Amino acid sequence: MSAGAQAVDAVASRRLALLYHPHSFSVFALAGAARTLCELVWIVDTTIDGTEAMLPMLERMGTVVDVTGLDQEATVAAMAAQRPDGILTLKDSLMQRTAALAERLALPFHDSEVARRFTDKHLQRVALRDGGVPVPGFWEVPELADAAAWESLHALASFPAVLKPRYNSEGSRDTIRVESIEQVRAAVGFGAEAGERFVLEEYLGDRRDGVRAGFADYVSVESIVSNGEVSQLAVTGRFPPAEPFRESGFFIDAELSEADRRRALAAARAAVAALGVRIGALHTEIKFTPDGPRVIELNGRIGGGVPEMLHDATGVELLAIALRLALGESVVFAAPPVTSRVAYLFYVQAPLWMTTVTRVDGLDRLAADPAVSELTLNRGPGQCVDWREGNHGHVFSVGGTVADHDALIAFERRIHDEVTIEGVGDDAVPCGGDPAHAAA
């Protein structure tokens, strides 16, 4: 056997346990990233909505280990039998479980305390503040029955503010602006029915100087950490969010002055240190304010849409890097990769009032544009839309590349000129009902 063949066999023999969630990155993208690196061992729990339907596909793309209903000891035993060389999840709600399993299996991953900081917004903000990282003011929202704690919150909190779910919240789900303590109580009372807990954050004012008209004043820094060494791969720019805080568009590379870029990278690096992160791919959100940059949040996973944009702009394969890190490889970049074009991803959202889509027109014309590489209809006629879903409730997404930021601004205008979204509100059409009867 040749040395080359031996190397291929060594790579192919590696096994990565991936705790799967159907609302994370696609099976095809993950399998493609693993193709020359390792065999995937899909760890599945069919109590997670959408998982059972994916089992036939997962079985074609690796080994499936079903841990539904198993306790910790049985789960560890089932996974150990597969002899994994690494472990990974790309979903916040599975982060703490993955950390606990990694510790039992002696595999590299975030430790349990770091995983808690990634999935508990209050704990994360405490760690960032205590580490000297500039963050918005924040306050823990108590349970409704704790009258003394509510009096304290009323005395300490400032308004307007932003109310967010405290645990495992992704994509601006159920995130709202509140103007008073009464609005906070009302929202918490509604969420309490589902056992939801919340955190209240200072509403950060906008900084308009240094920001092109049409772009937002917040960015994200895409980083990796390998054995404690941080490499920063890109700064992702944003378009202004749809109400109340739903993402509408992202692009790599952000249009920033050199001074602002340095500030963003420094804030992201400080956040990584404050949380004690030693491994993984990270997504750090930063807002520029009149008083300087503030770290909004640090995610212990890859941001949605980032792998595609980073690849289109630089050629770097971020999902493959995440797998390599999980397998224990050392991956370090001396400097951020150079961008050749501007890569974008738009989430086109329904108006805040809309509850059911009745018509989407113009997608075929938009898809024919040479700047478009992918267009996906997420909510079609007859389907429900709900702003509470945050980013995930968008009507359609469109991704691709353009030559520069001027072309990006022009393309964003074209999307809204070309595509028409029609719908109804106030439950005029029940979810799954016939949109033809909307005007009846």
Segments and roles (model prediction):
Residues 333-370:
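A glycine-rich beta-turn/hairpin centered on an aromatic-Pro dipeptide
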Residues 134-136, 160-163, 175-214, 218, ...:
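Conserved ATP-binding module of the ATP-grasp superfamily
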Residues 225-230, 288-291, 350-351:
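Short acidic-glycine loop/turn motifs at beta-strand connectors
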Residues 1-114, 123, 145, 328, ...:
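ATP-binding N-terminal substructure of ATP-dependent carboxylate-amine bond-forming enzymes
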Residues 78-84, 155-157, 194:
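Glycine-rich phosphate-binding loop signature in dinucleotide/nucleotide-binding domains
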Residues 104-175:
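A conserved helix-loop-beta module that forms one wall/lid of the active-site cleft
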Residues 205, 211-277, 281, 299-321, ...:
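ATP-dependent carboxylate/phosphate-activation module, predominantly the ATP-grasp catalytic core
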Residues 277-290, 431-435:
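A short glycine-rich, hydrophobically flanked beta-strand micro-motif that places a catalytic Asp/Glu
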